[in-house]
Amino acid sequence: MTSGVRMHAMPEDGTCAIAEVNRPAISVVVIGRNEGTRLVRCIESVRQAHGITIREIIYVDSASTDGSPEFASHLGATVIVVRPERPTAAIGRNVGWRHAASDLILFLDGDTILDPDFAFSAYEVLSQDVSLAAVWGHRREIHPETSLYNRVLDLDWMYRAGLSEFCGGDVLMRRDALVKTRGFDETLIAGEEPELCRRIRNLGYGILHIDCPMTGHDLEILRWSQYWKRATRAGYAYASVSEKFRMSADPFWTADRRRNMMRGSFWGVSFIVSVVASLWAGVLPFVLWLSILLLASIRSAWKARWKGASPGVLLLYGLHSHLQQLPILFGQLQFQLGKRRKKAQRLIEYKGRPVA
């Protein structure tokens, strides 16, 4: 699976040198493919972490063609290039943590920027509570002003602090929990973090979301097609993860998957019916459908008001929470079709060209 491991010395400034006395040390695993300058920005942010020693930065690259491995190597990271037939984020993360030397592993996506205080804050929490296996914080969009998609989807990253069922791709984890669970499921093209968290929780560990900044993220969604693909991938994740635990004593995401099917079907079928009816009875049926969608969006916006966005953005977020059910439904149906045909789904990518 790996096409070679290249080891590189850490910078002479000591940012990523051997752990200093009395300072906690962690390993950082960054994964990416064709992230370009986003990757450079990510690694540089790791080197600026406060209060903690970065023992090593391990960058696992999925056969980039934009020079990402060379960028990471120049910044002092250990670079591992993987070339699987079916690349997944899970493969990269597993390769990374298995090469790491520390008991605590900070996972990052290559398109993120680490908040300088998060690693130490998360370390403090884990060191004080042995029942926790993972700690994560707030991920927010770096450029919400770039598009309405970015501005609205920025709110999707916001979760209330406290114990949670799962985390995302940016998280500080105990190596012990990864060893006991054997890490991420490499067959999943999406949803690998919640799936792992489900198995971690079954071991008796907790997953904690703390109320502090963790990472900045760059969705870079500028077109409807990108939005559709991202939501389709989410639907595929719901279906594939819930299918894995469907017959277990502790099913996971089964209710979510069923609810997604119902909501997506409702909006899709009702839209078609309203359009067809409008051909015979004028615009009234379609206006009625729009009114129902608007009322549902207002209700969702009101429920999300704790996220602190402006009324206009909240209304768009409410609209998003319903319209995304269509591509989510499509993703779930895509999983079912692939399962019936016994055909593995390749990675669903929504980003455009890499940033050079």
Model regions: which residues?
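A conserved acidic beta->alpha catalytic loop
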Residues: S45, D61-P69, T112-I113
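Conserved donor NDP-sugar-binding/catalytic core segment of glycosyltransferases
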Residues: I113-L148, D218
